């Protein structure tokens, strides 16, 4: 290993990059299946990992250092802080990591010429379809309570308008105590129409005096 690293120093960098990349992605892939299970072993053999980009090359050392300094900090919070620090770097400061990412990408294409990125989709949980619907029962009101509620609306009834309409007609047709105001209005309207029709009939039957 020492002779090969002296002859090919890039080989040592590549192996170190792969090792660091595996350590960074362990927390993400470990939640899919228990470690050491046959499913996890088969996925690790079949799945080809993406090459690291410039940010991943830069953050692999920064992430480890920040995790050591803040052991209680969540991984998502570390990623947010690293992303903010990466944006503040100048293009000149990012250049070495961009070049390293290009080299790793070219090496990845050489080792896996048929590679095509296929993101893993989360399985759709069928729990949403199987959730029972909420059955909310409407409150039931006994019939006797309905009659008790009706007395509360007695004060909202309209006033007796029979005296008002009686001033326009000689004899009241209906009594306001037994009929609703709208029925009284209809009755008075029918009486007015009958009086108008009778006056038209009497006018048409009255003879006119001959002209001299």
From Swiss-Prot:
Probable transcription factor. Involved in the terminal differentiation of some neuronal cell types. Dispensable for neuronal fate commitment during embryogenesis. GO terms for cellular component: nucleus. This is Transcription factor sox-3. Disruption phenotype: Expression of immunoglobulin superfamily adhesion molecules rig-5 and lad-2 is abolished in the dorsal and ventral SAA neurons, while expression of the neuropeptide flp-7 gene is lost in the dorsal SAA subtype but remains unaffected in the ventral SAA subtype. No effect on the number of rab-3 expressing neurons on a sox-2 mutant background. Gene3D superfamilies: High mobility group box domain. One of its GO terms (molecular function) is RNA polymerase II cis-regulatory region sequence-specific DNA binding. The lineage of its organism: Eukaryota, Metazoa, Ecdysozoa, Nematoda, Chromadorea. It comes from Caenorhabditis elegans. The gene is sox-3. SMART domains: HMG (SM00398). Signal peptide: none annotated.
């Amino acid at each position: 290993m020492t002779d090969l690293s002296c002859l090919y120093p890039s080989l040592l960098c590549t192996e170190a990059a792969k090792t660091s990349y595996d350590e960074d992605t362990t927390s993400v892939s470990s939640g899919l299946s228990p470690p050491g299970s046959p499913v996890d072993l088969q996925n690790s053999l079949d799945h080809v990992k993406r090459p690291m980009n410039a940010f991943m090359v830069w953050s692999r050392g920064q992430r480890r250092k920040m995790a050591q300094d803040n052991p209680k900090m969540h991984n998502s919070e570390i990623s947010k802080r690293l992303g903010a620090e990466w944006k503040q770097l100048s293009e000149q400061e990012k250049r070495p990591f961009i070049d390293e990412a290009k080299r790793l990408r070219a090496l990845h294409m050489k080792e896996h010429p048929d590679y095509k990125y296929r993101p893993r989709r989360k399985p759709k949980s069928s729990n949403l379809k199987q959730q029972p619907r909420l059955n909310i029962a409407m409150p039931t009101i006994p019939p006797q309570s309905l009659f008790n509620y009706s007395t509360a609306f007695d004060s909202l009834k309209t006033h007796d308008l029979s005296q008002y309409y009686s001033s326009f007609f000689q004899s009241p047709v209906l009594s306001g105590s037994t009929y609703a105001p709208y029925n009284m209005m209809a009755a008075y309207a029918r009486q007015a129409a009958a009086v108008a029709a009778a006056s038209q009939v009497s006018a048409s039957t009255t003879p006119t005096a001959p002209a001299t």
